[in-house]
């Protein structure tokens, strides 16, 4: 009983914080309450609900060989340290979605998005990711379409594979558009991103051949290299020689992305994909952690009300009522069907032990939900006039914060 006392206290803190967030009407609410509520709920859910699913629903057996062990080929099936695999999986599921969706949903107020993210991820989103990962792992790392074909027949499997293909085309097109817009004519950004490729390959070779299993060492080396790439990128951008070399048009970047995808798909996963995703996690989690620490220190009040008049569906940022459009707008961070494709992709082929599945499947989704919470908080602490000016068409709300208020 004694070992459960800290978790009981954490749960009580979470309930109190969530109650303050939910029942406050009219008065100012501190952003710290949302952060405390989310962190407390996520910790308790991971400690008890994920453990319950693992033990009593899936009956996870750490002694049972995983596909990465049984079918190890050094290419796709590679037993990977769970810390690296967590970073790989988290980077794959946490793209722009958990940032963009909550920011857009803030036009309805902070309360709907907060409740949906917390309860959605704990009861559904993380469970889905965990379950699909486990099922794929037990079926030799089969993809979602193949799993459906095995369970429901050839016709259903073919339809699922075609649907998954179309979803991937659409999602990759959107993500590529974001990347191209961010890196076009930006030598600083392009150099930093390009530097992560040889850096990741060096990390992969280090843990594979030089110092196997030394994740702490390679993490420090990778972090130093990443910081150096970011800092040196400014000098590259200002250089009359190197600046033009790393300056590309949108069309050129499209071809570069296609070429990178083709090369990455044939290289061993331990050489590029896994270490590069792990490396990028430093930036993602580091930025979110810094934002969380800033909120804890500054404790800013939420400027956005709990509910706005735009819950009816006539908002200037996007049109649509609370139901169902809130749940469509915030998918990544709460419940995302796209994650089923990731959880049945490379990840189940890399798990070294079934005991790592809760951390990777359930835990990574909770981390993405925390990213979504921080994005929602970041949007909600802005003055509403500033928020709508930044996110709405000028034809609807004007060109300054005063006209948007």
Language model: regions and residue ranges:
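Hydrophobic, membrane-embedded alpha-helices of multi-pass small-molecule transporters
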Residues: 14, 80-97, 249-267, 293-300, ...
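Membrane-interface "cap" regions at the ends of multi-pass membrane proteins
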Residues: 1-13, 44-99, 281, 320-321, ...
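Extracellular loop-to-transmembrane helix junctions
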Residues: 28-47, 51, 105-135, 145, ...
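Membrane-water interface regions at transmembrane-helix termini and the short interhelical loops
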Residues: 18-25, 107, 135, 174-185, ...
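Flexible loop linkers connecting adjacent transmembrane helices
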Residues: 51-78, 104, 114, 118, ...
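Extracellular/periplasmic helix-exit of transmembrane alpha-helices
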Residues: 295-311, 366-405
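Hydrophobic alpha-helical segments and their helix-loop junctions in multi-pass secondary transporters
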Residues: 185, 204, 208, 224-255, ...
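Membrane-interface helix-loop-helix modules in multi-pass membrane proteins
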Residues: 19-24, 76-139, 150-154, 170-185, ...
């Amino acid at each position: 009983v004694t070992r459960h006392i800290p978790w009981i206290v954490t749960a009580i803190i979470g309930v109190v914080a969530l109650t303050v967030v939910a029942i406050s009407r009219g008065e100012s609410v501190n952003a710290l309450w949302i952060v405390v509520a989310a962190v407390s709920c996520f910790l308790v859910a991971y400690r008890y609900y994920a453990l319950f699913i693992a033990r009593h629903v899936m009956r996870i057996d750490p002694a049972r060989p995983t596909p990465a062990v049984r079918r190890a080929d050094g290419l796709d099936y590679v037993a990977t340290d769970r810390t690296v695999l967590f970073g790989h999986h988290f980077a794959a599921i946490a793209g722009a979605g958990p940032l963009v969706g909550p920011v857009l949903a803030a036009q309805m107020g902070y309360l709907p998005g907060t409740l949906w993210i917390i309860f959605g991820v704990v009861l559904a989103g993380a469970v889905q990711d965990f379950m699909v990962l486990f099922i794929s792992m037990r079926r030799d790392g089969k993809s979602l379409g193949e799993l459906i074909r095995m369970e429901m027949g050839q016709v259903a499997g073919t339809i699922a594979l075609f649907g998954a293909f179309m979803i991937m085309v659409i999602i990759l097109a959107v993500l590529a558009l974001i990347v191209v817009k961010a890196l076009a004519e930006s030598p600083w950004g392009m150099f930093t991103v390009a530097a992560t490729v040889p850096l990741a390959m060096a990390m992969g070779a280090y843990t594979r051949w030089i110092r196997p299993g030394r994740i702490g060492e390679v993490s420090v080396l990778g972090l130093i290299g990443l910081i150096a790439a970011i800092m040196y990128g400014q000098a590259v951008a200002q250089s009359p020689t190197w600046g033009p070399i790393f300056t590309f048009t949108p069309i050129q970047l499209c071809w570069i992305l296609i070429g990178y995808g083709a090369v990455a798909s044939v290289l061993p996963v331990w050489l590029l994909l896994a270490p590069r995703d792990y490396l990028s996690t430093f930036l993602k989690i580091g930025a979110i952690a810094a934002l969380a620490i800033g909120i804890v220190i500054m404790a800013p009040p939420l400027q956005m009300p709990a509910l706005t008049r735009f819950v009816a569906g006539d908002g200037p940022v996007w049109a649509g009522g609370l139901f169902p459009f809130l749940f469509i707008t915030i998918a990544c961070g709460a419940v995302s069907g796209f994650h089923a494709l990731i959880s049945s992709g490379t990840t189940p082929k890399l798990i070294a032990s079934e005991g790592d599945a809760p951390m990777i499947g359930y835990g990574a989704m909770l981390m993405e939900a925390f990213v979504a919470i921080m994005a929602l908080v970041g949007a909600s602490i802005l003055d509403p006039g500033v928020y709508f000016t930044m996110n709405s068409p000028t034809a609807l709300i004007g060109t300054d914060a005063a006209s948007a208020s």
